[in-house]
Amino acid sequence: MTDSDCVLCAGREMDGVLLVTEVWSNEFWRLTTTTVGEIAGYSYLSTHRHIEDISALDGDEQESFGAVVWRTTSAIKEATGADHVYVYVMGDGIDHLHLHLAPWRGPTSPLVDDPIKGLVTR
């Protein structure tokens, strides 16, 4: 896959297709939140640079990673009233590093069932 074929590299151009909206970004990272779905505040943190996994982060991305994950999960927790914000790294569907940030609001949370809905294809 080239950067031009990547839906996450396209940035805001693909937000409508992906059903997300950008809520924050800096020079290395972009945070989007779902506009539809069972879990209010379900978000994605992705790199601006096209890389496929965490081991490909460069020095500046590595240095900012922990602080950015802490800031974004803290903001999601506060905004949604979640008890926890779980962080998942999965990339089978989109070959561009992105973290799933999933607010959890106790045992009645939709997250208990299955956070990622849809057809899984191989």
Task: Cite the ranges covered by each PLM segment.
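HIT superfamily nucleotide-processing domains
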Residues: 1-122
